[in-house]
Design a protein with these regions (language model features):
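Anionic N-terminal interaction surfaces
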Residues: 1-19
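Glycine-centered tight beta-turn/hairpin loop motif at sheet-sheet or coil-to-beta transitions
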Residues: 10-12, 27-28, 64-70
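Phosphoinositide-binding peripheral membrane targeting modules
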Residues: 14-56
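Acidic, Ser/Thr- and proline-rich intrinsically disordered linker/docking segments
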Residues: 40-134
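Glutamate identity and glutamate-enriched acidic tracts
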Residues: 4-5, 11, 26, 89, ...
Length: 135
């Protein structure tokens, strides 16, 4: 069933997202993360500078799973002065694809969300599961 969904999935960075799982390509292997195990999807941008002049930006997309593991969904590098926002686009695509199947997944990063997941992981998992069960 999953192999039939791959051609219609969302491809970005180094993963393919389908309505039932996210497949992450890692060093000659494929990690399959079921949608029911996804708690939080967020991005991180690291800026590289030389003599205080921006040289590049590293955009990394992360996924926090039910087991507490944080998985990188891939990285894109842009120029230091680039206005591109590949993370926003990738997160929006994932949200559009996954929302009908699992409404409780948290998207985007804020310190408040990070503190909530770090301080009460079991409660955060219950919250995501409860919101996913809502009609």
């Amino acid at each position: 069933m999953l192999d039939q969904q791959i051609p219609y999935g969302v491809e970005a960075f180094s993963f393919v997202a389908t309505p039932t799982a996210i497949l992450v390509y890692e060093a000659k292997t494929v990690r399959v993360i079921p949608i029911r195990d996804i708690m939080w999807i967020y991005g991180n941008v690291v800026k590289q500078t030389m003599n205080f002049i921006p040289t590049s930006k590293f955009h990394t997309l992360y996924l926090l799973a039910r087991d507490g593991g944080t998985y990188s969904l891939g990285q894109i590098t842009t120029g230091g002065f680039s206005k591109k926002a590949p993370l926003d686009e990738a997160v929006a695509q994932l949200q559009n694809l996954l929302f009908p199947y699992r409404k409780g997944i948290v998207y985007g990063y804020s310190d408040e969300i990070a503190n909530y997941f770090q301080g009460n992981f079991a409660g955060a998992v219950q919250m995501v599961d409860a919101k996913s069960m809502e009609p």
